[in-house]
Swiss-Prot record:
This is 3-hydroxyacyl-[acyl-carrier-protein] dehydratase FabZ. The lineage of its organism: Bacteria, Pseudomonadati, Pseudomonadota, Gammaproteobacteria, Legionellales. Its EC number is 4.2.1.59. It comes from Coxiella burnetii (strain Dugway 5J108-111). Involved in unsaturated fatty acids biosynthesis. Catalyzes the dehydration of short chain beta-hydroxyacyl-ACPs and long chain saturated and unsaturated beta-hydroxyacyl-ACPs. Keywords: Cytoplasm, Lipid A biosynthesis, Lipid biosynthesis, Lipid metabolism, Lyase. GO terms for molecular function: (3R)-hydroxyacyl-[acyl-carrier-protein] dehydratase activity. Belongs to the thioester dehydratase family. FabZ subfamily. It is an enzyme of class 4 (lyase). It is found in: Cytoplasm.
Length: 142
């Protein structure tokens, strides 16, 4: 799924669209996506000028956007739908390496549980197969 298709399923836009491509989807189960991190990202202007590092909260947001696409595809919502899923919680977040300009972030989300509209995911972000971040994410329809 390319960027044009991604924009049909989630409402995020520049500068807050943090997924470039979806490379694998298993409805109701998992999704793998990528984010190409470039020096032109607006957040690098202030985080940090001497050594640009992608903010951890934006890595978490990237995982949440991947989860959002998985929800939409799992529920068979049509392109251009108006549903928005919001964070309901983030648990057990850990950051293991920095993400810098030039890195390609691989984002993997797996459905752990769906109950009464609350979706719980396991998220993992890696660079060159090295763990950058992991967290459990919860989302609910807004």
């Amino acid at each position: 799924m390319n960027i044009t298709d991604i924009k049909k399923y989630i409402p995020h836009r520049y500068p807050f669209l943090l997924i470039d491509r979806v490379i694998k989807i298993e409805k109701d189960k998992s999704l793998v996506a990528i984010k190409n991190v470039t020096v032109n990202e607006p957040f690098f202007t202030g985080h940090f000028p001497v050594r640009p590092v992608m903010p951890g909260v934006l890595i978490i947001e990237s995982l949440a956007q991947a989860a959002g696409i998985l929800i939409v595809k799992s529920l068979n919502l049509p392109e251009g739908h108006k549903d928005i899923y919001f964070f309901a919680g983030v648990d057990n977040a850990r950051f293991k390496r920095v993400v810098e300009p030039g890195d390609q972030l691989t984002l993997e989300v797996k459905v752990l549980k769906v109950h009464r509209g609350l979706w719980k995911f396991e998220g993992k972000a890696t660079v060159d197969d090295q763990l950058a971040c992991k967290a459990e994410l919860m989302t609910i329809k807004g």
